[in-house]
């Protein structure tokens, strides 16, 4: 999981982390699952950016949708 910090003009600092969410039905639900799971342990989530979408395929059938999400949250010292 890659992380980096970003500073804004107000002096606040935000950390960006990368997550992969999965779903059996859609990329949108996969992204939502990633954000929901992150919200259980991270505070002050700010922006989620979908950076990549793919599917797991077996025998010609889609088994799972995956969404890679860059998620920013306020960095607390």
Descriptions of predicted regions:
Residues 2-77:
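N-terminal, polar/charged subdomain of small-to-medium soluble alpha/beta proteins
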């Amino acid at each position: 999981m890659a992380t980096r910090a970003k500073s804004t003009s107000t002096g606040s600092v935000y950390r960006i982390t990368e997550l992969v969410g999965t779903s059996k039905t859609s990329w949108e639900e996969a992204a939502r699952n990633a954000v929901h799971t992150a919200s259980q342990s991270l505070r002050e989530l700010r922006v989620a950016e979908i950076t990549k979408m793919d599917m797991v395929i077996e025998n010609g059938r889609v088994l799972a949708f995956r969404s890679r999400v860059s998620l920013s949250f306020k960095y607390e010292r």
